[in-house]
């Protein structure tokens, strides 16, 4: 007879190992698992470990040619989710040897590959990953990081200000450049290509790059400050993307941009390496993230996509605004903001952080708050995000009744007022509106902005709860 026992496997015999002591080199994953009715938690957890590592549905004779114990993923802990009747957090440990060095693509193909279509599960969500130093050290990470960016731009002690150029599609390159110039001249640090501006018939990329570079140099000459515009280098092929980044580099501008999820991790990592080699900062937009992270029970939480970006490389990444939303969501957002910026982040389940993460001097990423914010939000944003952030006001700049430059002035005055008030010991949360009102007395631009966006409040339920 054959020398192995053929037949369909009972996963939990091999892959459920509650006594396993995790190694410092293991990649650890926390999955939110919703099994099909009648599937026990241990079997579901073991199935996740198996399907995302070495397992297949039946015993194969080639199993005998390798050491499964060395290479298999292990489900080492299961805990029920409070308030849900059939949902579990399943912890899986993966041996480091399963992953190619320096490849986010390969890491995700294994951990969030076929397993998400597995029939025994109703739903599956990857909540968090612990990336061990042994693996993170195989990545270059962000092209420059927070400190180098501040030194390049000569801007310290405050958040940076940005603005997305609108209308996002339809402007000619020259008019687009005019809009950029007005914003930068008024006091913003950056303007931004919208994520869907690539190279369309009404505005080809090379024309846009040229007119935006002209706007940058003109605004720098006028203000004596270093300016930037996130030139979106995202393209249909990696070769074309690098060509666009190279043109930006030739123009001498400080920063380019990439849509990292639609562009893909392989393209993003290539661009990130190019940016470090050529002294370009890299701004990352997360278009498509909600397709992956919005459902509570299925998909991948954004904190994992954020960690993946820090490995793949980017100097800025969009990370939500928090403002006016519920407290729980604030804690969770600040959790992944810390994962982006800090070197060492303690496990803290109240902030959605399932594992202690130690990046070991991998450069940090600036979180970008963007979307629906205006001058009245400035005190809250300054308090929540602190100095190491980029605050982006698209409509909150361009919607100013007097035009782009006064809109930029209003935002800069509001920001400087908030930073000064904070440094003098005022409580931004309590006295925010008063600080803005006081500043608007000597800035007609800010006063006009305050009038347009009277103290608006957002009233939606939090999507992202624990």
UniProtKB/Swiss-Prot annotation:
Pfam families: RuBisCO_large (PF00016), RuBisCO_large_N (PF02788). The modification N6-carboxylysine is found at residue 192. It is found in: Plastid, Chloroplast. Keywords: Calvin cycle, Carbon dioxide fixation, Chloroplast, Disulfide bond, Lyase, Magnesium, Metal-binding, Methylation, Monooxygenase, Oxidoreductase, Photorespiration, Photosynthesis, Plastid. The active site is at residues 166, 285. The basic functional RuBisCO is composed of a large chain homodimer in a 'head-to-tail' conformation. In form I RuBisCO this homodimer is arranged in a barrel-like tetramer with the small subunits forming a tetrameric 'cap' on each end of the 'barrel'. Heterohexadecamer of 8 large chains and 8 small chains; disulfide-linked. The disulfide link is formed within the large subunit homodimers. This is Ribulose bisphosphate carboxylase large chain. It comes from Drosera peltata. The gene is rbcL.
């Amino acid at each position: 007879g054959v020398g192995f026992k053929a037949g369909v496997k009972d996963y939990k015999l091999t892959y459920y190992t509650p006594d396993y002591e995790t190694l410092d080199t293991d990649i650890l994953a926390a999955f939110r698992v919703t099994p099909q009715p009648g599937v026990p938690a241990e079997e579901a957890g073991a199935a996740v470990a198996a399907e995302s590592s070495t397992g297949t549905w039946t015993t194969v004779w080639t199993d005998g040619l390798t050491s499964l114990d060395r290479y298999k993923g292990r489900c080492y802990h299961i805990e029920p989710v409070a308030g849900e009747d059939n949902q579990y957090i399943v912890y899986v440990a993966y041996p480091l040897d399963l992953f190619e060095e320096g490849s986010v693509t390969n890491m995700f193909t294994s951990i969030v590959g076929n397993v998400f279509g597995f029939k025994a599960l109703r739903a599956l969500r990857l909540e968090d990953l612990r990336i061990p130093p042994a693996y993170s050290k195989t990545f270059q990470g962000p092209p420059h990081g927070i400190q180098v960016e501040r030194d390049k731009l000569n801007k310290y002690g405050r958040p940076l200000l940005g603005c997305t150029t609108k209308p996002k599609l339809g402007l000619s390159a020259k008019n687009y450049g005019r809009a950029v110039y007005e914003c930068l001249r008024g006091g913003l640090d950056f303007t931004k290509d919208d994520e869907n501006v690539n190279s369309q018939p009404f505005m080809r990329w090379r024309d846009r790059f040229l007119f935006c570079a002209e706007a940058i140099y003109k605004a720098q000459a006028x203000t004596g400050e270093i300016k930037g515009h996130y030139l979106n280098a995202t393209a249909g092929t990696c070769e074309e993307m690098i060509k666009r980044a190279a043109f930006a580099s030739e123009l001498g501008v400080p920063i380019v941009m990439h849509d990292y999820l639609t562009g893909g991790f392989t393209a993003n990592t290539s661009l990130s390496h190019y940016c470090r080699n050529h002294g370009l900062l890299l701004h990352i937009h997360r278009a498509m993230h909600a397709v992956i992270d919005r459902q509570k029970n299925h998909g991948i939480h954004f904190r994992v996509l954020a960690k993946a970006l820090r490995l793949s490389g980017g100097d800025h990444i969009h990370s939500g605004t928090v403002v006016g939303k519920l407290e729980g969501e604030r804690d969770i957002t600040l959790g992944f903001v810390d994962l982006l910026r800090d070197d060492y982040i303690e496990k803290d389940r109240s902030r959605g952080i399932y594992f202690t993460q130690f990046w070991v001097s991998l450069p940090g990423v600036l979180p970008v708050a963007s979307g629906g914010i205006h001058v009245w939000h400035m005190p809250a944003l300054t308090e929540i995000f602190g100095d190491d952030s980029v605050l982006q006001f698209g409509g909150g700049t361009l919607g100013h009744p007097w035009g782009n430059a006064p809109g930029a002035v209003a935002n800069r005055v509001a920001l400087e007022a908030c930073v000064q008030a904070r440094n003098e010991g005022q409580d931004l949360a309590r006295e925010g509106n008063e600080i803005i009102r006081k500043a608007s007395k000597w800035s007609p631009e800010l006063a006009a902005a305050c009038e347009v966006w009277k103290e608006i409040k957002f009233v939606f339920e939090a999507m992202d709860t624990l």
